[in-house]
C-alpha cells in the first residue's frame, strides 16, 4: 500500500523527474539546493494539497513556467491508483484520482496518510496549542471519518458566533443563545472523539516506546478540552460571555484545546535536552503512524527532512531503533548517504538510495 511511483514537472528546480520508490526506506541525498527536500515537499503536497515550506504557491512553480504537476501511484493491495495535483500561477488547483477530477483535497489525504519531521517540527513542544491540535487532529482525520465533517460544521458555527460577538446586532444575545446549542452539541462530539483517540494513542505509545526510550517511562500526556473539566461547556460559554463580547471572539471550546507533555509536573521542553526532545518527537510520530495503520488498514508515509542534522551517533542509533517499530513507507533526505547508516541499520527493511544533483535524479 505504498507510493510506488512519483513524477514531477516544473516543481521548484526540478524540470522533470520520475521516482520509483521502494515500500521500505528511501534515502534521498545530495548537496544543499540539489532538490532533495523538494522531493519530500512534492510527496507532502500530493497528500495535503499544500507545502510544508511555504504558503506562496508561485515560489514552487519553476521559473518562467505556468504550472507545476505532480503525479503518483498509490499501491493498495492489488490495485495501483493514479493520483495527481497541479497548480497554476493564477492559483488554480486541479486534482485527479483514478483519472477523475476531484475538488476535495481531503480525498487525496484519506488515500495517502503522510506525516513529516523537519527541523521545525519541534514546534510541537515549543509552539502554541495550534501546533499540538494539528498533530492530534491529523490522526483523528484518518481514523474517525466523522471527525472531519464534525470539525467543518463546528467551525461554521464558531465563525457565526464570533461574527455576532464582533458586530453585536440587535438582540444578538438571543441569537448567540440559539447558536450555542449547536456549538455545544458539535463541541462535545469532537471532544469525545479526541479523548478516546488520546487514550488509544497513549496506550500504544507507552506499550511500544517504553522499551526503547527509558526517558518516557515517567512521562505524562495531559489533555485540556478547551474548557474546565469541572464545568460544562454550556456553563463556560455563559460565564465567559461578557469577556467574549468585549474581545469579539469565543474563548472556550474545542478550538482552544491543547495537550502537554510533562515529567513530575515539569514541561518536557524545560527539562529535556535537545537530543531527548528529538527522540520524543520521533516516538510520537511513529506512534501516530502506527495507530493510523492499525485502525485503517492503510500504510502511511513518513517523510524525514535533513535527518542527521545535529544528531549524535548514539541518538541516530536510537532513532533507528524507534523507526524499526514503524511499518510506514519512509523517505529520508540527507546531505551525505553515509551519515545515516546508524539510523538505517536497526530498521532491517528494504532500502533504496537516490542521489539528487541540480534537480536531476541518479538511482544507486
Swiss-Prot record:
Pfam families xrefs: SMC_N
Cellular component annotations (GO), alphabetically ordered: cytoplasm
One GO molecular-function entry: ATP binding
InterPro entries xref list: DNA-binding_RecF, DNA-binding_RecF_CS, P-loop_NTPase, RecF/RecN/SMC_N, RecF_2
Location(s), subcellular: Cytoplasm
Residue ranges that the Swiss-Prot or TrEMBL entry lists as coiled coil: none
Family note: Belongs to the RecF family.
Function: The RecF protein is involved in DNA metabolism; it is required for DNA replication and normal SOS inducibility. RecF binds preferentially to single-stranded, linear DNA. It also seems to bind ATP.
Name of the featured protein: DNA replication and repair protein RecF
Organism: Pseudoalteromonas translucida (strain TAC 125)
Taxonomic path: Bacteria, Pseudomonadati, Pseudomonadota, Gammaproteobacteria, Alteromonadales
